[in-house]
Amino acid sequence: MRVLDEIAESPFLISPLNPNSTANGYRWVDKCHGFLHNTVLVAASLFFVAYLAYEAKKSLSKLSNRRSYIMIAYYGCLWLVSLLNLAWCCLQGWECTPGKEVVWNLLTLFTTSGMLFLEVSLVAFLFQGNYASGAEALTRTFLISGFIVALDLLLKAIFLFGFGVPLFIDNNENGKTFKWGLWIIHKLLLTGVYGMVFLMYNSRWREKLPARPAFYNYIIIMFALYSLYLVASAFTANNAHFGFWLYGIMSVCYHALYLPLLYITFLADFFQEEDLNLENVYYSEMKDAGFFDSDWE
């Protein structure tokens, strides 16, 4: 335990929130968690939004060709959540700015709820087997996701604004044990869900899930992420500095890398398949027009 605490206190690693940093005249990028923490978050989220914007015209064209209701809705949700996440990453200084507690809590609440909605939607989609494009499949997926996320958001709002539990502000020591107990339960539930899907992929029930390596790798990554989140929450609840440091690392990884991972897992294959379909169409049209007749002579 002592070795872990020494690692967590290293000046080269992401530091815990410093409530006095706003009084030192630092720039916004240095506030609260430090330069490294904020720079990684802003750079990663900004790069991903820029990539989405760069590919937007091509992506919208492919979505309109396939007319998949699920993909169109999911792509729109991804854009909305990506912009929310970018705002959250850029406004890290609000976490330790007096008078910004309420607006920071609201921003964090809606950002994390949006990301959780994408997570739950993808898991719900996995249980439907292959790609579905009907309005019924879209409605069923989003109803399940919406109900779970609405319940999660409601409970967090009650603890935040009803009981004053500082779920998203780490420099407030009031209710610390209770706060981290809530996070342990939250991460335990998510770890359990991904663990269950992982076991299904390695059992006779795997035939009910999409036979795509990308989905399997996604489940492994998310299971590992929430397992580490759970360990970090348990350490922090027991006043171990290592736990707080590890939780910060996992938070950076989640907000910086989750949305790109989701895009690669769920949407990139869809767009790639559309390219292959278009190539097959072009090939068929050229073959019908006699472009390849000389090859048979």
UniProtKB/Swiss-Prot annotation:
Annotated TM spans: 34-54, 70-90, 107-127, 142-162, 180-200, 215-235, 242-262
GO cellular component: membrane
Protein topology in the membrane: Multi-pass membrane protein
Protein's UniProt keywords contain Transmembrane helix: yes
Compartment(s) of residence: Membrane
InterPro entries: TPRA1/CAND2/CAND8
Role of this protein: G-protein coupled receptor. Plays a role in plants and microbes interactions.
Name assigned to this protein: Protein CANDIDATE G-PROTEIN COUPLED RECEPTOR 8
Organism listed in the record: Arabidopsis thaliana
Gene (name only): CAND8
